[in-house]
């Protein structure tokens, strides 16, 4: 049982030190994907608008 507690303690210390960084990284990945998708869509729309105005 003491080995388990020791492991748990080490895991908790690691989480306290690096948990925020890990969570932030995951959030950035998730948000980044969404933002990236939106940015791509915006770029496509802008591209279409620019091409449309050039034709006229």
UniProtKB/Swiss-Prot annotation:
Domain of life: Viruses
GO process annotations (BP): killing of cells of another organism
GO cellular component: host cell plasma membrane; membrane
UniProt key word Cytoplasm: no
Keyword DNA-binding included in the entry's annotation: no
Record's subcellular location: Host cell outer membrane; Host cell inner membrane
Keywords carried by this UniProt record: Antimicrobial, Cytolysis, Host cell inner membrane, Host cell lysis by virus, Host cell membrane, Host cell outer membrane, Host membrane, Membrane, Viral release from host cell
Function: Disrupts the host outer membranes during host lysis.
Name the UniProt record assigns to this protein: Disruptin gp28
